[in-house]
């Protein structure tokens, strides 16, 4: 009576191993799902950044105001007879 129980327990363990720890097991599926969620969050962040950059490029292509603003703030350039006063923000 003892041998069939031992054989059955070993058989259950042998059949459960691939399900939990095998190549397509639950642990691997859980890990891939976690990686997928992290990648989706990264993609969403990058899409928002790209949208902002696209808007900035459109603004730079369409008008001179954005170019003038960049020239003032980044390069410190001014128009003739213009005084530019820049007050830095507190960090």
UniProtKB/Swiss-Prot annotation:
Residues 28-74 form a coiled coil. It holds the Pfam family DivIC. It is found in: Cell inner membrane. Keywords: Cell cycle, Cell division, Cell inner membrane, Cell membrane, Coiled coil, Membrane, Transmembrane, Transmembrane helix. Residues 1-3 are cytoplasmic. The keyword Cell membrane applies. Residues 22-91 are periplasmic. InterPro entries: Cell_div_FtsB (IPR023081), FtsL/DivIC (IPR007060). Part of a complex composed of FtsB, FtsL and FtsQ. Belongs to the FtsB family. Essential cell division protein. May link together the upstream cell division proteins, which are predominantly cytoplasmic, with the downstream cell division proteins, which are predominantly periplasmic. This is Cell division protein FtsB.
């Amino acid at each position: 009576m003892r041998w069939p129980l031992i054989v059955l327990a070993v058989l259950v363990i042998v059949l459960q191993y691939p399900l939990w720890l095998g190549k397509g097991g639950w642990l691997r599926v859980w890990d891939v799902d976690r990686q997928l969620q992290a990648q989706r969050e990264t993609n969403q962040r990058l899409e928002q950044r790209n949208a902002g950059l696209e808007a900035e490029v459109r603004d730079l292509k369409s008008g001179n105001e954005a170019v003038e603003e960049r020239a003032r703030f980044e390069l410190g350039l001014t128009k003739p007879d213009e005084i530019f006063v820049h007050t830095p923000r507190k960090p």
